[in-house]
């Protein structure tokens, strides 16, 4: 499909993500909760360096209701055996923010050019780049 071709040929990685995840992995458990189908996720992240920082990945096939429903994030909390108060969702979409809030999890939005016009007024935190995340976590 066009979408999979695009994913295979375009570099859509976030600059500096490996360094940020390496720093965070020293103190935090992390997972990816995505609305992508697992097949598309694997196209985006084949043998990707970010996966070894993650305890697990939840893809679209792993849950019944997609974001903005809270189910994906509630499932992640369950897998971590963690209460919402001990979690922070990092999002870049309005639907993801809505899902995090519906699951009663604090959410930090990382700005990107695709979601400039979205309503992120319910986010607890706003980050210009992912590189700001370690400092935010140290401050909270």
Regions found by a protein language model. Give the residues of each.
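Metal-dependent phosphoesterase signature
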Residues: 1-22
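Short, flexible loop segments at the rims of nucleotide/cofactor-binding pockets, characterized by
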Residues: 7-11, 35, 104
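Asp-based, Mg2+/Mn2+-dependent phosphohydrolase catalytic module
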Residues: 22, 37-140
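Glycine-centered short loops/turns at secondary-structure junctions
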Residues: 27-28, 104
């Amino acid at each position: 499909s066009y979408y999979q071709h695009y994913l295979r040929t375009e570099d859509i990685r976030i600059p500096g993500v490996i360094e940020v995840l390496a720093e965070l992995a020293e103190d935090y458990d992390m997972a990816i909760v995505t609305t992508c189908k697992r097949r598309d996720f694997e196209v985006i992240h084949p043998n990707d360096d970010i996966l070894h920082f993650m305890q697990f990945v939840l893809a679209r096939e792993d849950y019944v209701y997609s974001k903005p429903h809270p189910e994906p994030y509630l499932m992640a909390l369950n897998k971590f055996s963690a209460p919402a108060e001990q979690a922070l969702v990092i999002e870049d979409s309005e639907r993801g923010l809505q899902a995090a809030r519906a699951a009663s999890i604090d959410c930090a939005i990382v700005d990107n050019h695709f979601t400039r016009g979205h309503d992120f007024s319910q986010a607890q935190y706003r980050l210009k780049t992912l590189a700001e995340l370690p400092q935010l976590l140290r401050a909270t």
